[in-house]
């Protein structure tokens, strides 16, 4: 048995083990970064879906209940055209004004 070769082989195996350990460490860090990037992308996509759902629900509510909601908001703000109104019914002129207001506030952008 050649002790010089044994020592060189031993040092070579230790160096190879250190190199392989470093490769594994770098690979695990790469996987961690990739996993973190995928988690971030997933969270972003979930947030985007939640925002799109909220926007759809809001637009759907405005499409269905929009005029009634706007009239309620105008009534709550104290808008009363008819001085004889008791506050429990909406007259046609109030509905017309509410629709005109909704047209200019929600559909006109300039």
UniProtKB/Swiss-Prot annotation:
InterPro entries: Vesivirus_VP2. The keyword Membrane does not apply. It comes from the Viruses. Keywords: Capsid decoration protein, Capsid protein, Host cytoplasm, Virion. One of its GO terms (cellular component) is viral capsid, decoration. Its main location: virion. It holds the Pfam family Vesi_VP2. It is found in: Virion; Host cytoplasm. Homooligomer. The portal-like structure consists in 12 copies of VP2. Interacts with capsid protein VP1. The N-terminus domain points away from the virion surface. Minor structural protein that forms a portal-like structure at a unique three-fold axis of symmetry, following binding to the host receptor. The channel formed by VP2 may allow the delivery of the viral genome through the host endosomal membrane. Belongs to the vesivirus VP2 protein family. Translated by a ribosomal termination-reinitiation process from the bicistronic mRNA coding for VP1 and VP2. This is Minor capsid protein VP2. The lineage of its organism: Viruses, Riboviria, Orthornavirae, Pisuviricota, Pisoniviricetes.
């Amino acid at each position: 048995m050649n002790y010089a070769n044994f020592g060189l082989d031993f040092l070579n195996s230790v160096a190879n083990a250190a190199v392989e350990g470093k490769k594994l460490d770098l690979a695990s860090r790469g996987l961690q970064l990739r996993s973190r990037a995928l988690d971030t992308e997933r969270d972003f996509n979930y947030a985007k879906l939640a925002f799109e759902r909220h926007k759809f629900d809001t637009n759907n509510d405005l499409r269905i209940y929009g005029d009634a909601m706007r009239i309620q908001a105008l009534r709550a703000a104290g808008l009363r055209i008819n001085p004889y109104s008791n506050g429990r019914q909406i007259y046609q002129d109030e509905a017309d004004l509410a629709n005109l207001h909704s047209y200019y506030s929600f559909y006109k952008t300039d």
